Regions:
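Hydrophobic, membrane-interfacing alpha helices
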Residues: 1-292
Length: 292
């Protein structure tokens, strides 16, 4: 007996890669999902900085004008590092081919935050904390986009109910057509759930006594550990160095950076300030939304 019809759009959303077509112009569902992730991430950043005694309006503007391009460039450059052969043979095709890598975006976004801290005269640990606080929600929403687009797909599985991709437009079937209708681990959804757990932990830490830099250090140390575990479910062996995938190598670098930030945070010894009266929704409405 077939299940109820109402849940089909939810359970089969990964088989609706294309949102709409207009002539030769294609809009993938991934695009709006990433826009939602970025909107909430940048709105969160404006709120967190204002909550911490900073200028939320400046954070909103800086996010759109500097952090956003830095994240996109970082994601794209990290992805291109895995296509060096094609980049040498056909540079234009390699550059125009879609592909992004989260760890590159983390590096790009953190670099932009450090530049912004220098320009604005803000403690760099505060801006790194701001970036770190936005990451779990942004990644949770962004991985839903990956789930729908069919990128970052999981390994074949028979131990748990798997996702079956049937939409020929999905990236997994364009890259690996033999995986059509094969049950796969829902790797992007696993990441979304783990990210929501990290968001819950970060939210509980908000009013706890802590030094500046603790959020950034925690994210940079915890994210790689989680990524190492999740790599077991992903079907991506590109850029291997021995037993390490490219994602694991980036994760090791981020973990080392996190340990360094923990050291600086402890040496710095500046307690984080916060104002519980600052509302996320009012900050988003007053500081972020008017920019659109």
């Amino acid at each position: 007996m077939s299940g109820p019809k109402w849940h089909s759009p939810i359970t089969q959303i990964h088989n609706h890669t294309v949102l709409f077509r207009a002539g030769g112009f294609v809009v993938a569902t991934y695009g709006p999902m990433m826009a939602i992730a970025l909107f909430f991430g940048f709105a969160q950043g404006a709120w967190f900085l204002e909550y911490s005694g900073g200028d939320g309006g400046w954070m909103a503007r800086f996010s759109l004008l500097a952090v956003f391009p830095a994240v996109v460039i970082g994601c794209r450059l990290a992805s291109l590092m895995l296509d060096l052969d094609e980049l040498r043979k056909n540079p234009l095709r390699a550059i125009l081919k879609p592909g992004f890598m989260l760890q590159g975006g983390i590096i790009g976004g953190a670099s932009a935050m450090l530049v912004g801290a220098s320009m604005k005269g803000i403690d760099p640990l505060l801006l790194l904390d701001t970036a770190a606080f936005t990451m779990p929600l942004s990644e949770a929403l962004g991985r839903l986009g990956c789930h729908i687009y069919g990128c970052c797909w999981g390994r074949p599985t028979h131990s748990v109910p798997g996702l079956r991709y049937r939409d020929r437009d999905s990236k997994v079937l364009r890259c690996r057509p033999e995986l059509h209708n094969v049950p796969l681990h829902a790797a992007p959804l696993y990441t979304s759930l783990v990210s929501l757990g990290l968001l819950a932990a970060f939210t509980m830490m908000l009013e706890m006594p802590r030094n500046l830099g603790v959020y950034a250090a925690t994210y940079l140390c915890v994210h790689p550990i989680l990524r190492f575990g999740l790599e077991h479910f992903r079907d991506d062996d590109r850029g291997r160095l021995g037993s390490l995938t490219h994602s694991k190598m980036y994760a090791i670098l981020l973990f080392i950076a996190g340990c360094a930030v923990f050291y600086v945070s402890g040496s710095h010894g500046v307690l984080a300030q916060f104002d519980p009266s600052v509302s996320f929704w009012s900050t988003a409405r007053e500081q972020f939304w008017p920019l659109f």
